[in-house]
């Protein structure tokens, strides 16, 4: 695990974005951890979050021309990541996001920011069912752009109803790479170095045994 990944986990824990305990998910599964990126909700939080996304993007090796943030959670992520790439990596990358409702006056349309073109890196918080990705693909294709990859904060590495995860479905269906700042395996490695969190480590390992994808 790289230093920025460990720092991201600590950042998420400090902000209670990542919590351990017993949580009922929408799927009905009882999870020993919960991740809520909506709690990154201050200016300093967003500045730090952008730096983690930028570090992971520079680390992943996927070439891209533009950041796209799907409404609504992807909008601040795309914005802060673009700022971090410019300030910390000398990469001045254009960004774009969509409106849920098309505007009928002014500039009109449902896209805001730079023209949606070239190789697009879609940035979002997590992928649960892949619905937002599918909706975004319709927008990207309509503009004649191509999806270079998808960047998220956490990959739960968890099966859906079938044998693969929503992330693996996205990679299969759209022939792109999904990059995460951290994965569940990274969280487990972090817990392995924290003897005081041993009970959480046992619970997370058991959950992975039951619901984890085959990598």
From Swiss-Prot:
Oligomer status and interactors? Homodimer.
A biological process from GO: pyrimidine nucleotide biosynthetic process
Keywords tagged on the record: Glycosyltransferase, Magnesium, Pyrimidine biosynthesis, Transferase
Residues noted as binding 5-phospho-alpha-D-ribose 1-diphosphate in the record, renumbered to the chain: 26, 72-73, 99-100, 103, 105, 124-132
Family matches, as SUPFAM superfamilies: PRTase-like
Q: What does this protein do?
A: Catalyzes the transfer of a ribosyl phosphate group from 5-phosphoribose 1-diphosphate to orotate, leading to the formation of orotidine monophosphate (OMP).
Q: In which pathway does it act?
A: Pyrimidine metabolism; UMP biosynthesis via de novo pathway; UMP from orotate: step 1/2
* Disulphide-bridged cysteine pairs: none
Report what the protein is called: Orotate phosphoribosyltransferase
Listed GO cellular component terms? cytoplasm
- Protease is among the record's keywords: no
Per the UniProt entry, the Enzyme Commission number(s) are 2.4.2.10
Residues bound to orotate: 34-35, 128, 156
Q: Which InterPro entries match?
A: OPRT, Or_phspho_trans_dom, PRibTrfase_dom, PRTase-like
One MF annotation (Gene Ontology) recorded for this entry: magnesium ion binding
Q: Which cofactor does it need?
A: Mg(2+)
This enzyme catalyses: orotidine 5'-phosphate + diphosphate = orotate + 5-phospho-alpha-D-ribose 1-diphosphate
The highest taxon in the source lineage is: Bacteria
What is this enzyme's class at the first EC digit?
transferase
Tell me which family the UniProt entry assigns to this protein.
Answer: Belongs to the purine/pyrimidine phosphoribosyltransferase family. PyrE subfamily.
